[in-house]
């Protein structure tokens, strides 16, 4: 689960981090009033969406005219913002963040992730702020400095100072950076973050550090113990198909291929996607129907997969461990009849009553291709997707 910038900054403020005074507004009038409340003669207005690249897409504006703030809000509220990180439809804009303008002397980067290799929270800092950190990592990795947090001792001041020296901070800035580092590290663990970024962390013209932007990703598996964070969820930013799948306890992730995949078990689902790729196909999705693959859930899974117009064939790969394959076969037949599937469907069944399940499919009279193995299934579905 991701948070909006204004939500991230509200958490930053709770931990004593320096952020701009700002207000998230639902209407153009609120945006104008927010500028008046903030005061000054220069403001920044930003579309609030779960995507980067807002500035290049016209979703960020610096202005000293309140009527321009009104016009900006009227233009974007209720519309979708398309950036390089969204699909062609973009993300809906429901709030506009109005902030005081900050005079910038230099831009830095500070972020943290859960690193699976070290099984630790790893902080990253760089002098290359304000740009895509992925690009920096690829082209000039030596400019990214790291600090690994030991879960037994927690964040240490010396780690902050080490990063601060590498960023070229002066003694005053070093103290500020240490406070920011320690606050972020504590916040990361307190709220079960999976990702955290301040890009840019700026040095103002007065020489102070300031959190100009904020990006936070939460570990969805921990939301049960984070009621406050869970309450910040904005469903409008979710993929519609993924949100619909979640209602039926289906794990669905949209991809950009043309082979729909329906599998029971996350590991088997990933293996299925790999073998489709191996045989020249491109998966259109990851979809795990779980252990209890009932007719109703299979039907919903088909509906979700086929809602993607790019899908040209569907591969159903089921291992009958918890459930019997003949029962799954009945569910697939019922789902195909109910949904009215118009694309080729390849089914591979293994496990309990697998042979019986294949017989049920063969006698159904439907255009369902029963595969004899996973390799056969992958080859057949790739050919079907290509129209062969």
UniProtKB/Swiss-Prot annotation:
Succinyl-CoA synthetase functions in the citric acid cycle (TCA), coupling the hydrolysis of succinyl-CoA to the synthesis of either ATP or GTP and thus represents the only step of substrate-level phosphorylation in the TCA. The beta subunit provides nucleotide specificity of the enzyme and binds the substrate succinate, while the binding sites for coenzyme A and phosphate are found in the alpha subunit. Pathway: Carbohydrate metabolism; tricarboxylic acid cycle; succinate from succinyl-CoA (ligase route): step 1/1. Its EC number is 6.2.1.5. Its cofactor is Mg(2+). It comes from the Bacteria. It is an enzyme of class 6 (ligase). This is Succinate--CoA ligase [ADP-forming] subunit beta.
